[in-house]
Design a protein with these regions (language model features):
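An N-terminal assembly and electron-transfer interface module characteristic of large anaerobic redox
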Residues: 1-176
Length: 176
């Protein structure tokens, strides 16, 4: 490596600090924009508090959290002590409980890196809950380490496009 090149240039990967919102904030922004979509994050409690980035700074009318207690963002309260055991059964039960609520039309499931690396089969879990609930349950890959907010927003849209069955649908009439 020459004196003028940086490690980021020579290695091909850029691990410098970002001055932007995170991947997960982009996921929240997408969920905020789709009023029929609820989100379960396999991750610690701090994931819930990140809703303030949207509600406090971006959209004061956001419905991601509600004084009624029916929040559109939920988490599994994953703690590092739980990481070594299988969590799929409890994760599926939580996802099923959210999907079974009559006010919930659709649910997305994503994960923080600490959960993703343990190998839970999120796509299988979402398919099983969708089959039982009869509602769309979408798996959004947890790519928090590889992108920023716009990547998170795009990943939600890509996941919806790939996983929603739109056959038999019809365009909405435009309101004048």
């Amino acid at each position: 490596m020459s004196a003028t090149s940086s490690p980021q240039q020579s290695e091909g990967a850029d691990f410098t600090q970002r001055v932007t919102y995170t991947f997960m904030i982009g996921v929240y922004l997408a969920v905020n924009a789709i009023r029929d979509l609820y989100l379960l994050i396999e991750g610690p409690d701090c994931t819930y508090m990140k809703t303030q980035y949207v509600q406090g700074n971006h959209d004061w009318l956001s419905t991601l959290t509600s004084v009624s207690g029916l929040h559109r963002i939920a988490n599994t309260a994953l703690h590092p002590a739980q990481m070594s055991g299988s969590r799929e059964e409890s994760l599926q039960a939580t996802l099923q409980r959210i999907a079974s609520h009559p006010a919930v039309p659709a649910v997305a499931l994503t994960s923080m890196p600490m959960a993703f690396i343990t190998g839970a089969e999120y796509a299988r879990l979402t398919r099983q809950v969708a089959r039982v609930s009869g509602k769309p349950i979408i798996h959004v890959q947890g790519k928090s380490l590889s992108g920023d907010w716009i990547d998170g927003y795009a990943e939600v849209l890509l996941s919806l496009a790939r996983q929603l069955d739109l056959s038999g649908g019809s365009p909405c009439e435009t309101k004048a």
